[in-house]
């Protein structure tokens, strides 16, 4: 039966560490005692977490008894009780059957020798010599003998002065045969039987307690091991963070050095001009000073002929006032460097603020599981071999769209470009990092509308995909429900079941953004799809298959759809929808566009085909217009 030992842990509740009692199973597949799990969730409250894997449930799951596991536990407990304990397993100590030599009972007849037996009728203890009459005389034949008993008075009933030969488990006391009348509703037993029963109960309790002590020891070891794992993980992450911050400090130091050098170079340039001007002015001053001295000297001459000869020469020499040319620092350059530094500081503050915000839980309702995305089993449009063979470029983390630059215009230090190069090096070793994709997604969620418009593309509706009930106008940028069926010529890409139309161009890589104006905001949808999406039947409707993703307005309800799974969204008064498609990092975001952009829903998907903008209109008067950037 040694194989039952490892099974004991599998059949134990991780909350109470005991074998399952009325076991129930959670949706995530873990088993617990029904009472343990109910008490845990009652204290915990919403949201409800699985005590083992920490899976989150917004609503309390409906629990049912696991009858198969219950039967297995019962059979295990029966087998566990039936099997003999192995040699290396602890067993309770045996109860002493005879008094120790130090606690001998004296003979009540001679008071010298040690008693060998006690007569429960005579209520006396006898040595071997004085016990002989009980063996020889017929009068003593029915007297029960027991090993020597100390303090016989305790064996007598104080009420009836009779020997207490029975034990009442209900009142936990020994009673005589006359007391049985008062305990007729109880279940008394003989002293030997009651002693054996209690001994068996206590032995089993000790065995259970020993098992619990072992379980507690294992739990303590497990907690210590988990603490060690947490400590090692935290230390490893701290080292990684320190490395990242060291690199950021190096970038900041390099930026500071470059900016300081540019300003110093500008200072040197201006001072060099001032030095040149100073030398010119010094020479000019010397020339004027020499001319002044010559004039003063000529005025001292008394000979008129000599004076006229000298003065006529000096009179022809002209002088001009001293002129200082305009020389200033390049204030535009200095202001640009200073403003770029302020912008960088503000960007850092915003990034630090986002880091300090509480992280959303894993059960984010505004996010779709990429595992639910599959290829359509009924392709209509084939994808070229070149597209299938083409590899995705390594994802690059999106940096703020307007990072500052430093230095003179001819030698700019672009931190954004430096960040992209560093990110490209990082992604070369981890091309499919989920954490990197999550960071890029968070970066785009924090962008403003002007920043999103940097990725704007012009969407043209494809005439060959439009349903006969969809009218196209305004140079194929407006789709509406036609009052009369349109006589479009047959085409294999045309929708025949749902009033839908696709964009003309597909997108396999890169980042793309477009906006759609909704009129009437009723019975319409905006999304994306693979070119292989069905064009016929109910599965061709946007979001009702694995090849399309959309946000849909149906009466007053707004929903996100994919793979025929609906997620109800909060209502919005915005009449314009922005769609951001990031093929490289695998996500599409739907924004409600007003004065600011607000998140409606996001899907994270590892796209496998080229994607087309997709639109659905149904109700009369419903119109979708492709917007121009404003």
From Swiss-Prot:
Covalent link location (Glycyl lysine isopeptide (Lys-Gly) (interchain with G-Cter in ISG15)): 117
GO cellular component: cytoplasm; cytoplasmic stress granule; cytosol; nuclear body; nucleoplasm
Keyword hit for Cell division: no
Location of Phosphotyrosine modifications: 278
Location of region: Interaction with influenza A virus NS1: 180-450
Positions bound to Zn(2+) 2: 28, 30, 50, 53
A family per Pfam: PRY
Coiled-coil portions: 217-307
Major subcellular site: cytoplasm
Positions carrying Phosphoserine: 100
Keyword Cytoplasm part of the UniProt annotation: yes
Effect of residue 65 to R: No effect on ISGylation
Functional note: Functions as a ubiquitin E3 ligase and as an ISG15 E3 ligase. Involved in innate immune defense against viruses by mediating ubiquitination of RIGI and IFIH1. Mediates 'Lys-63'-linked polyubiquitination of the RIGI N-terminal CARD-like region and may play a role in signal transduction that leads to the production of interferons in response to viral infection. Mediates 'Lys-63'-linked polyubiquitination of IFIH1. Promotes ISGylation of 14-3-3 sigma (SFN), an adapter protein implicated in the regulation of a large spectrum signaling pathway. Mediates estrogen action in various target organs.
Name this polypeptide is given: E3 ubiquitin/ISG15 ligase TRIM25
Classification of source organism: Eukaryota, Metazoa, Chordata, Craniata, Vertebrata
């Amino acid at each position: 039966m040694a194989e039952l030992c490892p099974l004991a842990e599998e059949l134990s509740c991780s909350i109470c560490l005991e074998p399952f009692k009325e076991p129930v199973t959670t949706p995530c597949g873990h088993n617990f005692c029904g009472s343990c799990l109910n008490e845990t969730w009652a204290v915990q409250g919403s949201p409800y977490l699985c005590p083992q894997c920490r899976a989150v449930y917004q609503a309390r799951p409906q629990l049912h008894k696991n009858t198969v596991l219950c039967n297995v536990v019962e059979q295990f407990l029966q087998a566990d009780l039936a099997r003999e304990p192995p040699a290396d397993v602890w067993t309770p100590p045996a109860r002493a059957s005879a008094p120790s030599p130090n606690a001998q009972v004296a003979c009540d007849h001679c008071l010298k020798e040690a008693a060998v037996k006690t007569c429960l009728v005579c209520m006396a203890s006898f040595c071997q010599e004085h016990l002989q009459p009980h063996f020889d005389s017929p009068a003593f034949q029915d007297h029960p003998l027991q090993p020597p008993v100390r303090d016989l008075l305790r064996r007598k009933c104080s009420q009836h002065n009779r020997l207490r030969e029975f034990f009442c488990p209900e009142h936990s006391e020994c009673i005589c045969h006359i007391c049985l009348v008062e305990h007729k509703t109880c279940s008394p037993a003989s002293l030997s039987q009651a002693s054996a029963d209690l001994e068996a109960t206590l032995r089993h309790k000790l065995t259970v307690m020993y098992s619990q002590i072992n379980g507690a020891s294992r739990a303590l070891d497990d907690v210590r091991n988990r603490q060690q794992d947490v400590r090692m993980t935290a230390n490893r992450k701290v080292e990684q963070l320190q490395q990242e911050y060291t690199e950021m400090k190096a970038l900041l130091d390099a930026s500071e050095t470059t900016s300081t050098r540019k300003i110093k170079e500008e200072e040197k340039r201006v001072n060099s001009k001032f030095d040149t001007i100073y030398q010119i002015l010094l020479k000019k001053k010397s020339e004027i000073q020499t001319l002044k001295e010559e004039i003063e000297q000529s005025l001292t001459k008394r000979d008129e002929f000599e004076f006229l000869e000298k003065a006529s020469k000096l009179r022809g020499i002209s002088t001009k006032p001293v002129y200082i040319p305009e020389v200033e620092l390049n204030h535009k350059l200095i202001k640009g460097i200073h403003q770029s530094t302020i912008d960088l500081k503000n960007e850092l503050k915003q990034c630090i603020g986002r880091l300090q915000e509480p992280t959303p839980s894993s059960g984010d309702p505004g996010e779709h599981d990429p595992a639910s995305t599959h290829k359509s089993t009924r392709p209509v449009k084939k994808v070229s071999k070149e597209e299938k063979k083409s590899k995705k470029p390594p994802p690059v983390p999106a940096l703020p769209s307007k990072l500052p630059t430093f230095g003179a215009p001819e030698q700019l230090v672009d931190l954004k470009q430096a960040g992209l190069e560093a990110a490209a090096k990082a992604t070369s070793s981890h091309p499919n990092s989920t954490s990197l994709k999550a960071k890029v997604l968070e970066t785009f969620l924090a962008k403003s509308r002007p920043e999103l418009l940097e990725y704007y593309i012009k969407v043209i509706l494809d005439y060959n995909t439009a349903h006969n009930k969809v009218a196209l106008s305004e140079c194929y940028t407006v789709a509406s429900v036609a009052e009369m069926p349109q006589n479009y010529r047959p085409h294999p890409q045309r929708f025949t079941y749902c009033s839908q139309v696709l964009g003309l161009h597909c997108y396999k890589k890169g980042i793309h953004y477009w906006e759609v104006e909704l009129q009437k905001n009723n019975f319409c949808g905006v999304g994306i799809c693979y070119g292989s999406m069905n064009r016929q039947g109910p599965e061709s409707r946007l979001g009702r298959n694995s090849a399309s993703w959309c946000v849909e307005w149906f009466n007053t309800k707004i929903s996100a759809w994919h793979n025929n799974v609906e997620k109800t969204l909060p209502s919005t008064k915005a009449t314009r929808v922005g769609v951001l498609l990031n093929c490289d990092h695998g996500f599409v975001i739907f924004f409600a566009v007003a004065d600011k952009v607000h998140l409606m829903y996001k899907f994270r998907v590892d796209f496998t085909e080229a994607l087309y903008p997709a639109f659905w209109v149904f109700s009369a008067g419903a119109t979708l217009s492709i917007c121009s950037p404003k």
